[in-house]
A protein has these predicted regions:
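Carbohydrate-binding surface patches
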Residues: 481-547, 587
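Bacterial Sec-dependent N-terminal signal peptides
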Residues: 15-36
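An acidic-aromatic substrate-binding cleft motif
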Residues: 113-167
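Active-site-adjacent "subsite" loops/lids of carbohydrate-active enzymes
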Residues: 122-128, 136-141, 212, 216-281
Length: 593
């Protein structure tokens, strides 16, 4: 949670003028032009080894179609398509990504008309893909299923329940023995226990982990009536006269008054409140929020200066000890507290809320965060809370800019990360219920392909720690071409195609990320003016490899539904030459040893 400005508070007052304005029947992801014919889906976001996969089509394609089951470009099995619903038993090996493809002969040419990724993993933190929920009004079972089915199609395996709680210092409404059926959240929206529980049950059915959201060190203005001791609070003066707070205006019910996370009394109090949550709702864990760097020096009740971030590591460790079977994720706002605290604590993965953005550093901010997190955490994965088209969303209702979203998603994915994007709507602001921007049908189709691609090739994009140590597998690769296109080693440059190399045990992976037509190089695309990248085909490229390969193939989420295409190649004098079938936003070349 960033320090929300008064400008946004005034904006929220206009947008959220009634307690239940954001409802699932206004969901921009599900309806309208976003219908996709021949959409291939699975019954779960992820599967345990040994589980069968149920596949389904929303409409049957005409003519003869072949189902092909693949792993990293190799065909495991293929069979004629005979039904709109069927099952497949993946291999038993753990932590593997697969792609199921539908092939059809179109005018004498093999075309992939649909595909879907499949993640087989016993532990979700190996390949985390975060989504969110933010509205808990009265909902039918079918409404809940519709939202979760959308998240399932993006293979979301962690769902964080934003703004579900009653009070920051008392998240469960009522008591463990008498929980409320209906309560109001921080902005006075009605939340229903049946909806929260329905979402938890539905998420579990789809193989998703559920995390309840709450700030780790905050309370509302009525904290004294709930036995919060003033000695547990954080102050802006040494005489404990002024409580530090996160100001929120109307329509929010209260400012958030901040507590001292070092204080054992506060820790014990909040742990007891969390135990109440777990006794009523079978959440799988807690997504802990923070507020980043405080704008002024803060003190404890005795007048001692508080270093807020230095409490994060021990706080997380204590929470894990108290509830060892529950998962923990903690937000690092602008990386505050990540190094030496959060990253090395018992969190499932590193979660960074990204606020730094510029045309100068651009997409390189993502690569720096992801590699830093890997170093600081001994190889944990990274999820980025990166709010795209931010200023565009503040202007009011509108549409996401598809090229900007794709280019940010491609950069994060190529570097082994993922962006928190999908919920009842796509995310554009740190106040998660804000649904000002709508996905176009084009963007929804693209995001499905990109999430499928990230899952199908997860073993190449998010591999296990290399023998040489964390981040030792990345390398610079110089790509040349006899075409008019210019390639450069990462970071991105305008009018060029950036390259990233990665040495894996049995192959080298070369990523090509196109900025040929880029309006700018700012990942946020805050005003929504990033230009689309044109699709170009048959680009000859050459680059150095350490030895003659055994096989070379290419895949991109922008062409042939992400399916791998084996290509012809020539090797001479340490140089590999091949023709890349297509480049639009992101293409991956795999050179098998």
């Amino acid at each position: 949670m960033k320090r929300m400005s008064l400008i946004y508070i005034l904006f929220a007052a206009l947008v959220i003028s009634s307690c239940n304005i954001i409802e699932p029947d206004n969901d921009p992801v599900t309806y309208g032009e976003s219908y996709i014919p021949n959409l291939l889906s699975t019954d779960k976001a992820a599967y345990k080894p040994g589980e069968k996969v149920t596949l389904s089509l929303n409409s049957m394609p005409e003519g003869s179609v072949t189902v092909r089951y693949t792993h990293l470009g190799k065909i495991l099995k293929q069979e004629p398509l005979s039904s709109s619903r069927w099952t497949w038993q993946p291999p038993a090996e753990d932590f593997q990504g697969y792609m199921v493809e539908l092939h059809k002969n179109v005018n004498g040419r093999d075309e992939v008309i649909s595909s879907v990724g499949i993640d087989v993993s016993s532990e979700p933190s190996r390949f985390p893909r975060n989504g969110f929920l933010s509205t808990y009004g009265k909902m039918s079972a079918s409404d809940i299923a519709n939202v979760l089915n959308d998240l399932n199609r993006y293979h979301i395996n962690y769902v964080q329940f934003q703004d579900w709680h009653w009070k920051h210092h008392h998240p469960l409404a009522g008591s463990a023995t008498q929980p409320m059926d209906v309560w109001t959240d921080i902005i006075s929206r009605n939340c229903y226990r049946s909806t929260v529980q329905g979402y938890i049950d539905g998420a579990h059915k789809r193989g998703m982990v559920t995390l309840f959201y709450n700030l780790g060190y905050g309370c509302l203005e009525d904290y004294a009536t709930d036995d919060v001791n003033p000695e547990w609070l954080m102050y802006t003066d040494k005489l404990h006269t002024h409580v530090d707070n996160h100001p929120l205006g109307s329509p929010f019910k209260s400012a958030i008054y901040l507590t001292d996370l070092h204080n054992d009394g506060w820790r014990d109090y909040l742990r007891a409140r969390n135990d109440e949550v777990y006794s009523v709702f079978n959440f799988d864990g807690w997504q802990i929020d923070q507020l980043g760097v405080r704008p002024t020096t803060v003190y404890d009740y005795s007048g001692n200066v508080i270093d807020v971030q230095s409490a994060f590591g021990s706080f997380i460790a204590n929470e894990k000890t108290a509830q060892p079977n529950k998962r923990i994720v903690m937000n690092a706002v602008g990386q505050y507290g990540q190094q030496g605290q959060i990253a090395s604590a018992p969190v499932d993965f590193c979660y960074t809320e990204v606020w730094e953005h510029s045309n100068t550093d651009g997409y390189g901010i993502f690569s720096r965060i992801i590699t830093d997190n890997a170093n600081w955490s001994n190889g944990k994965q990274t999820v980025l809370a990166a709010y795209l088209n931010y200023d565009l969303g503040l202007k009011g209702r509108g549409y996401f800019n598809t090229p900007g979203i794709i280019m940010a998603t491609a950069a994060a994915s190529a570097w082994g990360g993922t962006i928190l994007q999908m919920g009842e709507h796509m995310l554009c602001h740190e106040y998660f219920p804000d649904d000002n921007l709508t996905m176009t049908g084009e963007l929804k189709r693209a995001m499905i392909r990109y999430y499928d691609f990230a899952v199908a090739y997860e073993n190449l994009l998010r591999p296990a720690t290399p023998a040489g140590g964390i981040n030792s597998d990345w390398y610079g690769v110089d790509v040349t071409s006899t075409s008019d296109y210019v390639f450069n080693q990462w970071g991105p440059k305008a009018n060029q195609i950036a390259t990233i190399g990665r040495h894996l045990d049995d192959c080298d992976v070369i990523h090509l990320l196109s900025y040929r037509n880029a309006t700018h190089l700012d990942w946020c695309d805050s005003d929504g003016d990033q230009a689309p990248q044109s699709l170009v085909k048959d680009i000859p490229v050459s680059f150095a490899v350490s030895a003659q390969p055994s096989r070379v193939w290419v895949a991109t989420p922008d062409y042939q539904q992400g399916a791998a295409q084996e290509v012809a190649w020539e090797y001479a004098g340490g140089q590999l030459t091949l023709t890349v079938p297509a480049i639009q936003y992101w293409t991956m070349i795999v050179v098998e040893k």
